[in-house]
């Protein structure tokens, strides 16, 4: 994609200041709450409708929670956590939960106690869970019965959480959840967010950042309130259709910032209906869309690809809008989607864990339908496009690194136990600006286009994979003396990981053995086949040292050519490294 040629003339544009190099939102600024003692849950409840509308629906069982049910359950669980387990300000609670009706209740109840919540994929391998427990030292773990058996030894209390509020179980830990819900009379008001305010930490959400191993992103109550107002509620205000009439399908994981911001927090303030899927499956999603007359479907590129591959082609008449985020979409996929679903309003958005999912949002108008763009800057947000070498600010039509500034930008990184800044925190957040690591440009209408990435994280189906995390797993193998992990492009997944392995001299380590080793250490999913599958290569007589960075792409191309003349030995034909999968 080429930048807008008209922008190269640098006209006088309302969203760009040539004097400062800053980009501002074309949307008017929105007032945000000024009370420093305000926390997320009271703010959310101030918007939550009082009528007995179905706020949450469990897609598999059709169980529902009304707005009144939801308010009561959050209040009751918060009181139970305080009184029975002494969860309060200074506590950290790990949510190891799948999508369910109970996830939003549990997440907000933890915040209502004044504690900090941290989320994790419930399908994580025991070694990954153990590492997270070491990093965060939680006061309490909330887990599902589906993954309780594989939990490593815990130093903190464990409470098993059901998928719905009608579920029964013989386990005493499971029963505690229900007893905690009975701690307060439904009619008795419960004080929310005791002792915490807007500047206090609310959640630690893990991200690969721009480099290195995964680290915790500390987001505050102010960040989450800004997300509710600048992302979810602002977008709803731009349409004439009442938000309460919308039905959203929650096919994205709530442990990820994209799903969390929408389904466990923001959309609840609108009083619309959220239909919750445990995990994405095309057939189940289609059934849910038709059964519940879903109007809005937030998704990531692999879900869009799966919908387009359905045979016979789908007819989803109730859908009004599909929004894509978390990973780039290629032009071919966009074209096919617009052709298959011409009645659907398709938009893209841009946000990061570090920006609490706030950044840009697409809006289609009679004048502008820029489907390949990630949209306009959100209200109250500012941006820079920074030259990669000189550090100077660039005008519209010029490529550079995207920097963001605004009330949704994270507080800090935490990397080890406690809220300690990681070494690259100052690099990532410079004078309040978030360096995204993404290469982008603004066109002459203020629309943002993402064209590449500086950072070495791998975007697999919308999930971030840190090469350093995979390298740390592989290098622990006794027959591997060096390893470099990079990525290769893939039409369906976006990117897939590739590992270059150096074996010990004389080792007969095979690709199959390496794969079996990785599978025991890293969360895996069902096989995923592609013509551009990743593969292992080994060097026995000499060693190449390379970090997983921009050099890796160059190495990948060189390796492909070198292997043809025998200078490199392929351990086996191309195979798949099974990574996180939302399907």
UniProtKB/Swiss-Prot annotation:
Residues engaged in binding (E)-4-coumaroyl-AMP: 258, 326, 348-349, 353, 455, 459
Enzyme Commission code: 6.2.1.12
GO terms under cellular component: peroxisome
Chain segments carrying region SBD1: 281-348
Cofactor(s) needed: Mg(2+)
KW Nucleotide-binding (keyword) present: yes
Highest taxon listed in the record's lineage: Eukaryota
Family assignment from sequence similarity: Belongs to the ATP-dependent AMP-binding enzyme family.
Stated role: Carboxylate--CoA ligase that may use 4-coumarate as substrate. Follows a two-step reaction mechanism, wherein the carboxylate substrate first undergoes adenylation by ATP, followed by a thioesterification in the presence of CoA to yield the final CoA thioester.
Protein name: 4-coumarate--CoA ligase-like 2
Source species: Oryza sativa subsp. japonica
The gene coding this protein: 4CLL2
């Amino acid at each position: 994609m080429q930048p807008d040629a008209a922008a190269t003339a640098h006209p006088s544009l309302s969203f760009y200041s040539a004097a400062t190099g800053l980009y501002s939102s074309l949307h008017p600024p929105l007032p945000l709450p000024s009370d420093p003692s305000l926390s997320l849950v009271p703010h959310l409840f101030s918007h939550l409708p009082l009528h007995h509308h179905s706020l949450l629906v469990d897609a598999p069982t059709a169980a529902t929670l009304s707005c009144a049910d939801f308010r009561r359950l959050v209040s009751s669980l918060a009181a139970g956590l305080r009184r029975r387990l002494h969860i309060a300000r200074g506590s950290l609670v790990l949510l190891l939960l799948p999508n369910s009706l109970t996830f939003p209740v549990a997440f907000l109840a933890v915040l209502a106690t004044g504690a900090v919540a941290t989320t994790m994929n419930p399908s994580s391998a025991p070694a990954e869970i153990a590492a997270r427990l070491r990093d965060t030292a939680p006061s309490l773990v909330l887990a599902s019965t589906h993954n309780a058996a594989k939990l490593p030894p815990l130093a903190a209390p464990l409470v098993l959480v059901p998928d719905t509020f009608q579920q029964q179980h013989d386990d005493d830990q499971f029963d505690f959840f229900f007893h905690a819900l009975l701690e307060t009379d439904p009619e008795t008001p419960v004080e929310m967010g005791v002792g915490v305010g807007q500047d206090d930490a609310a959640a630690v959400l893990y991200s690969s950042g721009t480099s290195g191993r995964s680290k915790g992103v500390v987001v505050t109550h102010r960040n989450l309130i800004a997300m509710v107002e600048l992302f979810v509620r602002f977008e709803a205000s731009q349409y004439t259709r009442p938000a309460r009439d919308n039905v959203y399908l929650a096919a994205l994981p709530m442990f990820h910032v994209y799903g969390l911001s929408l389904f466990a927090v923001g959309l609840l303030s609108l009083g619309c209906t959220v239909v919750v899927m445990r995990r994405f499956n095309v057939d189940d999603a289609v059934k849910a869309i038709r059964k519940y007359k879903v109007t809005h479907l937030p998704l990531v590129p692999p879900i869009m690809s799966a919908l387009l591959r359905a045979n016979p082609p789908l007819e989803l008449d109730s859908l009004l809008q599909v929004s894509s985020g978390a990973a780039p979409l290629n032009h071919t996929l966009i074209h096919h989607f617009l052709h298959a679903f011409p009645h659907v309003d398709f938009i893209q958005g841009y946000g990061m864990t570090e920006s609490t999912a706030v950044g840009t949002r697409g809006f289609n108008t009679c004048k502008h339908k820029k489907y390949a763009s990630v949209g306009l800057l959100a209200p109250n947000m500012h941006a820079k496009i920074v030259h990669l070498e000189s550090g100077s600010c660039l005008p519209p039509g010029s490529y550079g690194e995207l920097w963001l500034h605004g009330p949704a930008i994270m507080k800090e990184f935490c990397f080890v136990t406690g809220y300690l800044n990681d070494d690259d925190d100052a690099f990532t957040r410079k004078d309040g600006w978030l360096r995204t690591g993404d290469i982008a440009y603004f066109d002459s209408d203020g629309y943002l286009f993402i064209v590449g990435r500086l950072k070495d994280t791998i975007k697999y189906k919308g999930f971030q994979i840190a090469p350093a995390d995979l390298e740390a797993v592989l290098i622990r193998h006794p027959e591997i003396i060096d390893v470099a992990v990079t990525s290769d492009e893939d039409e369906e997944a976006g990117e897939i990981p590739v590992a270059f392995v150096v074996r010990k001299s004389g080792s007969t380590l095979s690709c199959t053995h390496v794969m079996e080793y990785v599978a025991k250490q890293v969360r895996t999913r069902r096989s995923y086949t592609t013509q551009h599958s990743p593969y292992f290569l080994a060097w026995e007589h000499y060693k190449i040292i390379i970090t997983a960075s921009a050099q890796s792409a160059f190495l990948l191309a060189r390796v492909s050519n070198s292997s043809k003349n025998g200078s490199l030995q392929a351990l086996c034909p191309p195979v798949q490294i099974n990574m996180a999968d939302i399907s």
